[in-house]
């Protein structure tokens, strides 16, 4: 059925095992688009690290194309620009996140702030380690690290925020949105 196929996401998952990290494991899956959310995390308009800012600029256009394609298939889009959601306080996307009915999460959500922001530390009881070392707050410049400064004010404009999308940097609000829509699968970008 052509219409049913259009609402499916045919994906290849790639992972590595702790025992053999050099070996890539691939698995083909099919997800229902309507039971899938795509979360865009920390694609800010600027970064105090020059290399991070450059990477966001390079990724934003292709990421927006992926977001548009996912949205067209029926994937729910959540924008999650940590620590700058107040920029969006009066938007319908922010209202959608704030108004989602409360839903208790199956495990406690992390509430331990990281670097004085809403960005929470991963909880090793439930999550693996990040694939990068972010102990320096995200600078990957060679040699001398960039000076930390207040840099981001919003999500980069290249990634479109449209009607039906949500915007939050709060774990409980995110869980509420996912539960309300009976989302089974999440793609984190």
Regions found by a protein language model. Give the residues of each.
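Acidic/histidine-rich, surface-exposed loop or edge segments in extracytoplasmic proteins
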Residues: 36-51
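Basic, amphipathic N-terminal segments that precede the first structured/catalytic domain
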Residues: 2-22
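Short His-Asn-centered micro-motif
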Residues: 41, 79-81, 189
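Proline/glycine-enriched tight loop/beta-turn segments at coil->beta junctions
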Residues: 31-34
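Active-site alpha/beta core segments
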Residues: 28, 61, 65-184
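Second-shell loop/turn segments in exported
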Residues: 48-57, 160-165
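Structural motif
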Residues: 36-37, 185-187
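Short, intrinsically disordered, charge-balanced linker/junction segments flanking boundaries
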Residues: 1, 186-189
